[in-house]
Amino acid sequence: MTDLHRLSIRELAEGLSQAKFSSRELTEHYLKRIAKIDPQVKSYVTVTPEQALREADAADAALKAGNATALTGIPLAHKDIFCTKGIKTTAGSKMLDNFISPYDATVVEKTKAAGLVTLGKVNMDEFAMGSTSESSYVGATSNPWALDHVPGGSSGGSAAAVAADLAPFATGTDTGGSIRQPASFCGLTGLKPTYGRVSRFGIIAYASSLDQAGPMARSAEDCAYLMNVIAGHDAKDSTSVKKELDDYVANLNNTSVKGLRIGIPKQYFNVAGLDADVKARVEESLKKLEEMGAALVEIDLNMTEAYVPTYYLIAPAEASSNLSRYDGVRYGYRCENPADLMDLYKRSRSEGFGPEVQRRILIGTYALSAGYYDAYYVKAQKVRRLIQQDFLKAFENVDVIAAPAAPTTAYKIGASLDPVEMYLGDIYTIAVNLAGLPAINAPVGFDKDNLPVGLQLIGNYWSESQLLSIVHQYQQNTDWHTKRAAIAEENA
């Protein structure tokens, strides 16, 4: 079959279980596509054909023996922030250019245990700090919808790989929108789960109180399949929560859109810089949900103006602490011929980290320094609590909150956005991480340049099933999630 890449996860699982094709055939199909198409997209940083085919053969044996899981034999790509035993894990940084992890992240461990086949590792912004995937040490990834545009970030490689049909689904991480914004830019569905729902063990840390892993795929149904594998408590992650798990696939039709109260924050739709096409597509998608029986309720989120300053104190402060371990001594990049220990520290860090990472370390170190700790970091944590309370108050009257995932569609690679402009572009996503809430992006159309637009739905704690179900039903009534970029239509 030449069009295996057009099948949904459910169709792939059915095809494998009914022996219409083997995992080896499916894996070879994707490896051929990667070899042909990825030189243009540049989504993969490491492709692992030998390991992938070994895992595919093991999956075929399990399928034959009748001891397969629901997803045995289906390939996927991992963001290069997840530690993978025996495979390079760089986090997009020169600092970790030659780092090979001695163990698997829990998410990777779980995908392997479920019989999924690892195609390779995909590109990202350096240490997940960025919204474009341009800050990666290996270079920028292209958006499959327009190769001279960014795919978003930091999980831009994950989004580009799925959008170009170079993987059926992929893992991502989200610290301030890094699943939802690239999903929006590339026309995909992407879920950021509640903080603590998916283990962070083996994820290279950026901001430990904000980082969360999640699935990126074409549809809510595809995301639900991957969530069934990766969600759950992990004793190796102290922030992982012991809470009963949902069957996300079985629950896809469990939330009725009829009678659903969707909160529309006034402040979100009056943000300076909100693109007219983005606003129009999001409003059209809300009209569709209203036609399906939902009620649109105007709400106030009065802390909106505090999102960006609060996030850009807390996230860099945690990054400054987490990245202090890279010193040129134990592992990671080490400068050549240091004059003394201080020279080793200084040069290893200044040569190993890119400008955006250095900028955030600098901001964070300043915010944590003795004279400014109370004025900046402690105050930001207090405001963070107010942001969380703002959401909880809203959820007393609505079931979910709607917003764009980003104020614009994808912009050109190299567009001279200054860092502050870039940070302001995160306005719709960062508060979700500050509050630890779940949120999902769904594709809802295109702008005048045929670039995808995304709708973000924010849920209350532990409502991943509800979010997936709402988007699944929306996708039963629309076809935006089935649209493909021209490059994805190419056959290998």
Curated annotation (Swiss-Prot):
Signal sequence region: none
PROSITE patterns: AMIDASES (PS00571)
Active site as annotated: K79, S154, S178
Catalytic function, reaction form: L-glutamyl-tRNA(Gln) + L-glutamine + ATP + H2O = L-glutaminyl-tRNA(Gln) + L-glutamate + ADP + phosphate + H(+)
Biological processes annotated in GO: translation
Family indicated by similarity: Belongs to the amidase family. GatA subfamily.
Entry keyword set: ATP-binding, Ligase, Nucleotide-binding, Protein biosynthesis
Top-level taxon of origin: Bacteria
Enzyme Commission designation: 6.3.5.7
Its job: Allows the formation of correctly charged Gln-tRNA(Gln) through the transamidation of misacylated Glu-tRNA(Gln) in organisms which lack glutaminyl-tRNA synthetase. The reaction takes place in the presence of glutamine and ATP through an activated gamma-phospho-Glu-tRNA(Gln).
Transmembrane segments: none
Name of protein: Glutamyl-tRNA(Gln) amidotransferase subunit A
Entry GO MF terms: ATP binding; glutaminyl-tRNA synthase (glutamine-hydrolyzing) activity
A Pfam family assignment: Amidase
Subunit field text: Heterotrimer of A, B and C subunits.
GO cellular component: glutamyl-tRNA(Gln) amidotransferase complex
Classification via NCBIfam families: gatA (TIGR00132)
